[in-house]
Amino acid sequence: MKYILVTGGVISGIGKGVIASSIGTILKSSNLHVTSIKIDPYINIDAGTFSPYEHGEVFVLDDGGEVDLDLGNYERFLDIRLTKDNNLTTGKIYQSVINKERKGDYLGKTVQVVPHITDAIQEWVMRQALIPVDEDGIEPEVCVIELGGTVGDIESMPFVEAFRQFQFKVRRENFCNIHVSLVPQPSATGEQKTKPTQNSVRELRGLGLSPDLVVCRCSTPLDTSVKEKISMFCHVEPQQVICVHDVSSIYRVPLLLEEQGVVDYFRQRLDLPIGRQPRRLLMKWKEMADRYERLLESCSIALVGKYTKFSDSYASVIKALEHSALAINHRLEIKYIDSADLEQETLQEEPVRYHEAWQKLCSSEGILVPGGFGVRGTEGKIQAIAWARKQKKPFLGVCLGMQLAVVEFARDVLGWTDANSTEFNPKTSHPVVIDMPEHNPGQMGGTMRLGKRRTIFHSQNSIMKKLYGGHEYVEERHRHRYEVNPELRRELEVRGLKFVGQDTEGERMEIVELEDHPYFVGVQYHPEFLSRPIKPSPPYFGLLLASVGRLSQYIERGCRLSPRDTYSDRSENSSPDAEIAELKLPMIDHD
């Protein structure tokens, strides 16, 4: 097993996650099996109760793990399935060690950070690195580990010390450290400054880790003189200084690393069994990056949510939209709308914001209402849903978005004016959305219906069934406490709101479609968590197709392949005016 540790310096949030994912991608393209571990030094057990404003979205895994959004990057880039133990937090480590101490496993010894916490970290990493993450079930050969935060943070000290010991335990030829640092370029001088990187590497080396590669994040490509200066002061060769400058799309980052000889360096440094032949997977990434840069047509989607001021709150939703837009050769334009701005209160208090929000909504080609919690902004979301339904605008509601679509329909079409979710109005006489038996209100963490669940299609004419390739069932990831009231199903269906997908017991409403509408779909699960750059998610793909007026054409052509299998390994036709059918139909693999 080979271990690649990615650390960060100067500031957090400079792209360690994307760089770690890109390293995994170029190694996977060399026919290696790669897994990933993300270490978060906070004391929380998991990311389940985080505010979206503080940490961005909570990413959900197959096993129900609520984890950092960086694990979403790993899954999308590497096309793997991780588990909750691939996200290691200080809270999990301390909980594990304290439980052992309570059971008497330490035989009365004084339990300390060194050696007990550091040993627990090393054991966790070595155990998790061996768990298969690919569909073929083969044990990984390389483990990419991202240490969150920056070197020098008091929270990450036990982890740095653990890896200082770890490099000797697994031996030098099996361990490699990549340090990601910022090279700022002040506008006053326009000169690239190396001092922050020098100090960061000096601090890392003082803690016992010496970087093998220094990855410099900068706005423009590094000058040769700057590379040489970093090489001289950071104890690395000039070819070990890697420049990752700002690029047009993140699909360029693996290509950028490949061009600078990162794979060749790993081959020598870690003695990896990598040939020098062209890598097919990277060719696919290059095709995607080229396609992205020459898109001519655009498609606008209104994202009506609560956390629109911080785009990371909807990271997977945005990626799923991008994947689908790229598949139909359209540039995505997202119009972020705070749902509270659509409400009557805003009209009274800030009429300009109100009219601007409605102008954005009305000028969009499709409308998306994603998941969320809490009552704030829900009436604005209902207003947006009503507009999409009445104006026959393509609409996708995810999780809470689906629940509110049912609430809006019950209010307007069935005439139940006080219809609501018991989350927002426990005393409503028409509880259209109710809490589930699993929900335990006494404790907030881990009390939702989480993880991969099966949804059975109950309608042969369902648009969603066709988009999923005609399969009898789908498996998608869930994260919710409330569900559509199954007792009201018949009354809603009689008026045209069809529940075309249910859980395996037929009790939970999972997919809803409106009759006589181009695309009005709600899903209780979160399809964005399984969207991939080369396998877009069917509900999002359907929204984009409907928004550009090509959904009926796509369905008429047979939908013989699920949108999850969009690109073949040899996608040779990538012109902007390519027919959808050419992208979707099976292509012969000539290899």
From Swiss-Prot:
Q: Name one GO biological process term.
A: pyrimidine nucleobase biosynthetic process
Q: Name one GO cellular component term.
A: cytoophidium
Question: What is the name of the protein in this document?
Answer: CTP synthase 1-A
Gene that encodes the chain: ctps1-a
Origin superkingdom: Eukaryota
Q: Which GO terms describe its molecular function?
A: ATP binding; CTP synthase activity; identical protein binding
Pathway as given in its UniProt record: Pyrimidine metabolism; CTP biosynthesis via de novo pathway; CTP from UDP: step 2/2
From which source organism is this entry?
Answer: Xenopus laevis (African clawed frog)
- Recorded family membership: Belongs to the CTP synthase family.
